[in-house]
Every structure is written in structure tokens, then in C-alpha cells.
């Protein structure tokens, strides 16, 4: 959803040549980090923990008919509170390493952590530029 936004296209260029191929995946994880980190500002009337409970209830209704890999992912996602823990950059590094471990073709995700760390402030600025606009588009059903 965010890949074609100008701020995201710009941020992809900040990745080194050896990690640029996985930049879209890494950036998606990073946007989730900022969303979790700034949740109370972005959604003051719906605390993150309440949202997590609501989202889990919604997903649980479709889980019985889902693929085993999706079911397995959800077992970890909810029990380990991933959406809450995304605010912690050490957890983001673990997430990227885990993805790389499961998919050898995505091994560059391990090193993409350094790109995130090097450009953290600029990435956060880009998040604040595109997120309100993206949410307005969602509200208008224009995205």
C-alpha cells in the first residue's frame, strides 16, 4: 500500500546496494515500528493494547480456514505481542533476522537493519509526512 508513495520511494534510495532489493520489506516493518511507537498520538481514543485484542478477535474468526503457515505465524504474533513489541528497535532487528532465517533468498534483511539505524531520524520524518495523508485516503476510500 505504501510502496508507491514519494516518501517511501525516496527512503528506498537510502539503502545500500546490497540491501536495496529487500528495502520494501524492511520499510514495511519500520513503518509498523513507528506506528507502534507513536500509537498514542495517532489513535488516542483506542489504546494499542485494546486494538491488539480487537484485531486478534477479528483474525481468529478466519484462522480455522487459513493455511498452516498463517496459523503458525498468528500463534507467535498474538502470544508474543508483536504489535506492541514493534516499538522496540531490538525487536525489529529480531524480526528481520527471523525473516531472513526462514527465507534464504531474503538474507539481505539481516543487513538492512544497518540502513534503518543509519537513517532512523529521516525515516521517522518520512513516516510523519505520509501517514496522515495515507489515512485520509483510506477514509475517503481512495487508496
Curated annotation (Swiss-Prot):
Keyword Cell membrane in annotation: no
GO biological process: fatty acid biosynthetic process
Catalytic activity as recorded in UniProt: holo-[ACP] + H2O = apo-[ACP] + (R)-4'-phosphopantetheine + H(+)
Keyword Protein biosynthesis attributed: no
Parts of the chain that traverse the membrane: none
Covalent S-S links between cysteines: none
Keywords of the record: Fatty acid biosynthesis, Fatty acid metabolism, Hydrolase, Lipid biosynthesis, Lipid metabolism
Source taxon at top rank: Bacteria
EC number: 3.1.4.14
GO MF, any single term: [acyl-carrier-protein] phosphodiesterase activity
Coiled coil regions, renumbered to chain: none
InterPro entries, alphabetized: ACP_PD (IPR007431)
Family of the protein in this entry: Belongs to the AcpH family.
Function as written in the Swiss-Prot or TrEMBL entry: Converts holo-ACP to apo-ACP by hydrolytic cleavage of the phosphopantetheine prosthetic group from ACP.
Protein name per UniProt: Putative acyl carrier protein phosphodiesterase
Organism from which the protein derives: Shigella dysenteriae serotype 1 (strain Sd197)
